[in-house]
Amino acid sequence: MEEIRFCPEHGFYRGEKCRCGAEGELILPKEKVEKLGKFISGVLRHFPDKFGLNMDENGWVNLESLARVVKRRYKWANIWLIKALVYSDEKQRYELKGDKIRARYGHSIDVKLSDFPEAKEDVLYYGTSEEEAHRMLEIGIKPVNQRYVHLSTTIEKSKEVASIRTDTPIVLEIDAKKAREDGIRIIKANDLIALAEEIPAKYIKRQIVFNQYSSS
């Protein structure tokens, strides 16, 4: 987890130096970035009701209400720091719109996300282990502990996700175009992630096998 800094020209960013080379003002040190990120992710993805937040069917909550919840946990937190977390997040975990905020993906609670755009990619990818890949080739890809199946727009991202759990990642190539034509709803959460309620096995085109020593 990297610190958050502010560049007068480019705004909030993660790390010691901005892309322009400037060493901006320190906004949040690493340990506070981690605490704030974990707490907000938990609230927006898993337990808004626990903190009395009213969440609509698309995952939106009021930003000021969230800030009050966060401040009860961390006295140093405020809306400005929440915005710094969102705008500097290269993984695009969150979305701000006016006076509302939501998590873009990772939900375990029932959210519809009906205002997300349809994913336009013809091919998408799902990273997994060898054992799980065999099962998915038979029964399809279903969500585990999350509301949606999380697909990647690139092979590299899928491999990265799978490599967290196994030394021999498998990437399943999904015929997203055919799935959409057949009525499977696939939505775009951000530049790297698409979501679907499930992917039946017939849309898995092939599997790509890697090992811990492979570079591609």
From Swiss-Prot:
Transferase as UniProt keyword: yes
Signal peptide location: none
This enzyme's EC code(s): 2.7.1.-
Keywords: NAD, Transferase
Family note: Belongs to the KptA/TPT1 family.
Reported function: Removes the 2'-phosphate from RNA via an intermediate in which the phosphate is ADP-ribosylated by NAD followed by a presumed transesterification to release the RNA and generate ADP-ribose 1''-2''-cyclic phosphate (APPR>P). May function as an ADP-ribosylase.
HAMAP family the UniProt entry points to: KptA
Protein's name in the database: Probable RNA 2'-phosphotransferase 1
Gene source species: Archaeoglobus fulgidus (strain ATCC 49558 / DSM 4304 / JCM 9628 / NBRC 100126 / VC-16)
